From Swiss-Prot:
Organism whose genome encodes this protein: Chlamydia pneumoniae (Chlamydophila pneumoniae)
EC number, as in UniProt: 3.1.1.29
Quaternary context: Monomer.
Protein name, UniProt field: Peptidyl-tRNA hydrolase
Reaction(s) catalysed (UniProt annotation): an N-acyl-L-alpha-aminoacyl-tRNA + H2O = an N-acyl-L-amino acid + a tRNA + H(+)
GO biological process entries: protein quality control for misfolded or incompletely synthesized proteins; rescue of stalled ribosome
Protein's gene: pth
Amino acid sequence: MAKLIVAIGNPRHGYANTRHNAGFLLADRLVEELQGPPFKPLSKCHALMTLVESSSGPLVFIKPTTFVNLSGKAVVLAKKYFNVALSHILVLADDVNRSFGKLRLCFNGGSGGHNGLKSITASLGSNEYWQLRFGVGRPLEEGVELSNFVLGKFSEEENLQLGSIFVEASTLFTEWCSKF
């Protein structure tokens, strides 16, 4: 049975490499490691998609072309289109409630205030799916709005750490794949 990996992020170029697009960055890295083909439009699911064959079965990666807050629409359409069990869905998302670089793989998790996760849970009618959370932290400076922070780019120091974080995330991803 196929597994559906959903990367949360905003689709426009101006949002590339922002904290809120950590899910997109992680998906790109995982697909590259798996030597998968490039993402291509799948308009019927409102997403960019790529299919990677792996030893644990087909892995369908999607990056919704909706904004973060409407991610659920793409997830429901892709779940139905690829006939994926709810428990075979993994959502890659940024997490302001975790320190930068801290990762968490969990099943049946909450939204932690993340509007993309709220949208997915509401659209699926359940939170019985997997999440791989990528800690982006919170602003250190007073007066910085959280929305501006997550829509901001990673600092130079953070960019230097992304490689080792992606290695750890890849290990957690492999662990998740082996569960089914």
